[in-house]
């Protein structure tokens, strides 16, 4: 019988898992943007047509990995958001940067929108890749690079694998 050993998950490539490995938490951990653009409430884009555009005031910026935006967005406001940025409260859709124009006046910055957007457009939902306690890898599975990436993203530190066996030829 081959015994088991605990190793760092990043060193698990081409090793055999000796136990089932589960996700420690939801991933992504919050609803976030799948594109660079502007977080808005989709209702603010209703009524837009080829002849009727809409202007939304930019009230902030969110980068991936930053803390959630503190303000609740009001009607006709937008927040610049990078891919992976957490959706601010009061928003439910992301307008890709290439689908709008930037406008500046002496005091404020705005985006000009020329089309409607649906609720949850360009949004990745909390847990859409992995839910907490999802099975990542079954016992006795050969660990590959995709598994290593999942372990890293989900904070899996150590894993149990089968010990390497030594074979000696004479």
Question: Each predicted region: which residue ranges?
Answer:
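Helix-rich terminal scaffold detector
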Residues: 160-170
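Phosphate-interaction motifs
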Residues: 1-157
């Amino acid at each position: 019988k081959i015994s088991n050993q605990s190793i760092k998950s990043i060193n698990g490539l081409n090793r055999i898992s000796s136990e089932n490995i589960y996700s420690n938490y939801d991933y992504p951990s919050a609803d976030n943007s799948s594109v660079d653009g502007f977080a808005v409430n989709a209702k603010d884009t209703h009524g837009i047509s080829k002849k009727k555009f809409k202007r939304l005031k930019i009230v902030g910026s969110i980068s991936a990995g930053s803390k959630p935006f503190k303000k609740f967005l009001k009607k006709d406001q937008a927040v610049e958001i990078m891919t992976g940025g957490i959706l601010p409260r009061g928003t439910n859709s992301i307008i890709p940067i290439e689908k709008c124009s930037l406008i500046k006046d002496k005091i404020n910055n705005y985006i000009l929108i020329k089309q409607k957007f649906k609720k949850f457009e360009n949004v990745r939902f909390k847990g859409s890749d992995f839910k907490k306690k999802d099975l990542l890898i079954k016992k006795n599975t050969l660990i590959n690079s995709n598994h290593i990436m999942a372990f890293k993203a989900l904070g899996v530190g150590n894993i149990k694998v089968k010990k390497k066996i030594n074979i000696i030829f004479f």
